[in-house]
């Protein structure tokens, strides 16, 4: 299986650089994984497709303002993008500068804060904050929302709200779980009123989600790792849902990866899970937990389009993407959504 198989040509004007005025005003492309049938809908019509007793699982991670600017002691400018918080004072980060900072060197951040370069781990730098404050407090003071590179504009105040789900709770992501951006409080209330059950997992999306796949053969790709948590109450809800013959609907690929990681860690039997996951889902994968998913449109040759292809069938997904391009759907983080049901194996 070649990475190039997952390529498609996307006109630049279909990349959404701003969100819709209202969260749920996006369009929704439905894809039946078994038949390949497509439907052009509005996102609010998702309400009609989720049945009473179904369980919707959301990722409640909170995006941190993970991009900081500063300079080295030598005066050279640099940009820091947090990959993950190690504790209240230390981060693993991507550093962009003309020359990499050396071990023990100081970094002067905007706002007068200082960090020390502690160690290098492959392409990532371990940095320690020299302050009474916590990393989160400093990020809230001087950090910028880490908009994906393809949005191709500086972050604005509005992004602090809109590049964040309404149900976010646990800070730690450096990219939004974007399928969740379409849900507002009214829609969540309408789902509950219909008898749909709602549950939350956490997966702190890392910047690795934007790293291109750099191999030709899909099987050779090494997946980045991210921290996920699937609590016992969610496991119990899933068991009840399955026992009643209802569906588990994951909102976003991060929710899919969290649930499938928990099943993988206990050899197919779903148990509570907390820890790092590097699960890589591509065609041929047998899904253990998820029956349907809400997801945005993903980048060509990305691990995310591979995951959706594993779920609904490669040919069906690539045909759906061509349809979306023809119908001028909006792509990527601030774009439109899909509702996809699983292809039977």
UniProtKB/Swiss-Prot annotation:
Keywords: Cytoplasm, Queuosine biosynthesis, S-adenosyl-L-methionine, Transferase
Cysteine disulfide links: none
EC number(s) given by UniProt: 2.4.99.17
Superkingdom field: Bacteria
InterPro entries for this protein: QueA, QueA_dom1, QueA_dom2, QueA_sf
Protein family according to the UniProt entry: Belongs to the QueA family.
Role description: Transfers and isomerizes the ribose moiety from AdoMet to the 7-aminomethyl group of 7-deazaguanine (preQ1-tRNA) to give epoxyqueuosine (oQ-tRNA).
Record's protein name: S-adenosylmethionine:tRNA ribosyltransferase-isomerase
Gene: queA
